[in-house]
C-alpha cells in the first residue's frame, strides 16, 4: 500500500468519489422516475423530489453488503492505492458524463466496476482481480435485466387476469395511486444498491491509508454523505434519459408502470441483500421491455433496446481502458 496520503489529497479523492455518487444520481435518476413520469402520474419536477427522498432513506432498510463487495470483492484490497481509486473514478466519471450528454442509459455501476478492474490490472496485473466477486458481478449484468423482465411480465399477466372484468378507466385510476408505492419501492432499491458502491470505494480508500484499523468496515459518516450525494444528484436528474426509458422503449399506462417498477424493485431488493452490485439501469430496462412484450412483441421498440444493450456491452471495456490509461498517466507523472 502507498505511504499515508496527505490529508488535503485524501479529502480531494473523497470529494471525487462523492462527485461520482452525485453523477450516479444524476445519470440514474431516470431509472427511479421514468415510468411514473411517462404515465403522467407525476410531473418530472415533483417526481425527482419523490425519488430523492426515498434514495436518501434507503440505508435504513438495507445492510452494507454491496459496499463490502465493492470494497474487497472486485479487486484485492491490498492492491488498492489512492492512484487506483482516482483512476477508477476517472474512468467511471468520464463515461457517465459522455453517456448522460448523449442521453444513453448506460450503467454507472458497471462503469465503476470496469474502472476498478482497469486500474487494478494496470497496477498489479490480472492477479489483482478477485475472480469470484467479479464473476458474480458480471453474471448479474445478464441476470438482473432478465429477472426484471420475467417478474414484470408475470406481474402484468397476473394483474390483467385479476382485473379482467374492470373497465380500463377503473384500472387506470387504481394503478395511478399504486404507482406511488411502486415508484417508492424502486427508489429505495436504487438508493440501497447504488449509494453503497461509492461507500465501498471511500471505505477501501480509508482502509488503504490505515484509517480503519485492521478490519474493513464502512463508517456511518461515509454512509450518510454517500446517500446525500446520490439524493442530491437525483434532484438534478436529466430529462433526456427519462424520455428514453419512459417512452422510447415502449408506451406505458399506470398499470404497466406499476408492474415494471415492482418487478425492478424486487430484483434490486434481492441483489442488495445478497451483496451483488447490479445495474439499476439494466434492471428497469429489462422490466419495461417485459411489460411491453406482455402486451405484444411489436410493442417494444427493439431498435432502441438494441442500442441500449450495445452501450451496456461497451461500458465495462471502455471504462477499464480509460481507468488503465489514467493510472499509467498518473504513474508516469508521479
Predicted regions and their residues:
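Multi-pass alpha-helical transmembrane bundle typical of ion/small-solute transporters
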Residues: 1-334
Amino acid at each position: 500500500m502507498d505511504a499515508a496520503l496527505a490529508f488535503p489529497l485524501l479529502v480531494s479523492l473523497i470529494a471525487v468519489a462523492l462527485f461520482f455518487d452525485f453523477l450516479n444520481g444524476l445519470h440514474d435518476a431516470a431509472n427511479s422516475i421514468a415510468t411514473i413520469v411517462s404515465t403522467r402520474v407525476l410531473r418530472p419536477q415533483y417526481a425527482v423530489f419523490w425519488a430523492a427522498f426515498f434514495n436518501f432513506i434507503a440505508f435504513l432498510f438495507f445492510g452494507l453488503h454491496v459496499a463490502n463487495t465493492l470494497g474487497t470483492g472486485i479487486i484485492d484490497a491490498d492492491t488498492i492505492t489512492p492512484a487506483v481509486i482516482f483512476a477508477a473514478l476517472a474512468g467511471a466519471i468520464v463515461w457517465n458524463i459522455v453517456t448522460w450528454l448523449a442521453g444513453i442509459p448506460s450503467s454507472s455501476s458497471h462503469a465503476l466496476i470496469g474502472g476498478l478492474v482497469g486500474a487494478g490490472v494496470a497496477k498489479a496485473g490480472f492477479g489483482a482481480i478477485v475472480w469470484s466477486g467479479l464473476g458474480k458481478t458480471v453474471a448479474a449484468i445478464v441476470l438482473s435485466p432478465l429477472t426484471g423482465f420475467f417478474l414484470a411480465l408475470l406481474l402484468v399477466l397476473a394483474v390483467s387476469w385479476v382485473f379482467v372484468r374492470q373497465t380500463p378507466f377503473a384500472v387506470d385510476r387504481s394503478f395511478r395511486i399504486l404507482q406511488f408505492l411502486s415508484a417508492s419501492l424502486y427508489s429505495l432499491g436504487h438508493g440501497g444498491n447504488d449509494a453503497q458502491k461509492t461507500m465501498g470505494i471511500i471505505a477501501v480508500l480509508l482502509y488503504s491509508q490505515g484509517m480503519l484499523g485492521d478490519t474493513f468496515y464502512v463508517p456511518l459518516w461515509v454512509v450518510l454523505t454517500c446517500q446525500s450525494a446520490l439524493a442530491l444528484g437525483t434532484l438534478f436528474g436529466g430529462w433526456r434519459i427519462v424520455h428514453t426509458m419512459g417512452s422510447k422503449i415502449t408506451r406505458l399506462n399506470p398499470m404497466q408502470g406499476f408492474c415494471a417498477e415492482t418487478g425492478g424493485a424486487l430484483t434490486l431488493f434481492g441483489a442488495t441483500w445478497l451483496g451483488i452490485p447490479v445495474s439499476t439501469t439494466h434492471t428497469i430496462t429489462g422490466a419495461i421491455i417485459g411489460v411491453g412484450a406482455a402486451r405484444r412483441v411489436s410493442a417494444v421498440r427493439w431498435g432502441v433496446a438494441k442500442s441500449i444493450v450495445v452501450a451496456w456491452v461497451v461500458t465495462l471495456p471502455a471504462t477499464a481502458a480509460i481507468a488503465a490509461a489514467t493510472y499509467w498517466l498518473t504513474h508516469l507523472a508521479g
